[in-house]
């Protein structure tokens, strides 16, 4: 039963917030009144459990209305969910997505272990990336007809979800602030050894597609291939073109999973604290309960190493500063599930249903304690 390996606790002082939409994102203080910032931690296939909690938060509850969130942020699998939330997806949209969601297709069967090992030795990653890309395309296309309309595109436009850029999202936010929300996701430019924040909160990413940013944020090292962007050292921006009409120095840079640096992109708020003077922070996090599993070979060892890194690895370098500066509300999912646990579609639907039902009944509840 699900009760054996999941519990949810929330460190929160519930606040009845009044949300006023803001179009100007360049003011000294990003938002003139207290706003809500909602982060979803990276955790591989553990994101299935997060969907169950989000389903609950879509309904009336004593904590927060998702439509009252101003910025959604996430890392790795959290970036996928954050993008959907930023695009204004409703509960029915995520339910539509869950209907065809199947994580068992992400990894090779154990019978293909020799081929998996060969791919790793020759290409540097364990798994073919087709199914991850298909998943991201699917979630970006859920409401594409509405998005086309809101962007004033022709009815017969071939504009797809994979074409949506950060600039498009900023345009949607300005025109329909009740529906679309700001986005903040992180990745790691391993070529420059830097944590990178891809966001609508500045102009550096206007030409980059949400599709590519998700792939960059969720590119588990040695599991999936890294993403590639070109870096212009003159403009200090990333681009798709390897050449320019000027003499700017352009380098091809590799991006890997944001969880290598931080499982939630809280550091962006610290680095830009003058722009976030009055915010409530909400963070959906995973705490993994250690469990024994036998190491049967190099592939199993790599999987365990990555699971350890993303489950117990580095958190925000300034978490103490965050707690001092902001009201921090933490939803902590305590799981024995691993980063690479795979679930078929029926299992996914059952997990999300059970979590939703248990949140609704109070069997899984949010404990209110003062944030420190």
Curated annotation (Swiss-Prot):
<feature type="domain" description="PNPLA">
    <location>
        <begin position="38"/>
        <end position="270"/>
    </location>
</feature>
<feature type="short sequence motif" description="GXGXXG">
    <location>
        <begin position="42"/>
        <end position="47"/>
    </location>
</feature>
<feature type="short sequence motif" description="DGA/G">
    <location>
        <begin position="257"/>
        <end position="259"/>
    </location>
</feature>
<feature type="active site" description="Proton acceptor">
    <location>
        <position position="257"/>
    </location>
</feature>
<keyword id="KW-0443">Lipid metabolism</keyword>
<dbReference type="InterPro" id="IPR050301">
    <property type="entry name" value="NTE"/>
</dbReference>
<dbReference type="GO" id="GO:0016787">
    <property type="term" value="F:hydrolase activity"/>
</dbReference>
<feature type="short sequence motif" description="GXSXG">
    <location>
        <begin position="74"/>
        <end position="78"/>
    </location>
</feature>
<keyword id="KW-0378">Hydrolase</keyword>
<dbReference type="Pfam" id="PF01734">
    <property type="entry name" value="Patatin"/>
</dbReference>
<dbReference type="GO" id="GO:0016042">
    <property type="term" value="P:lipid catabolic process"/>
</dbReference>
<keyword id="KW-0442">Lipid degradation</keyword>
<protein>
    <recommendedName>
        <fullName>Uncharacterized protein L620</fullName>
        <ecNumber>3.1.1.-</ecNumber>
    </recommendedName>
</protein>
<feature type="active site" description="Nucleophile">
    <location>
        <position position="76"/>
    </location>
</feature>
<comment type="function">
    <text>Probable lipid hydrolase.</text>
</comment>
<dbReference type="InterPro" id="IPR016035">
    <property type="entry name" value="Acyl_Trfase/lysoPLipase"/>
</dbReference>
<dbReference type="InterPro" id="IPR002641">
    <property type="entry name" value="PNPLA_dom"/>
</dbReference>
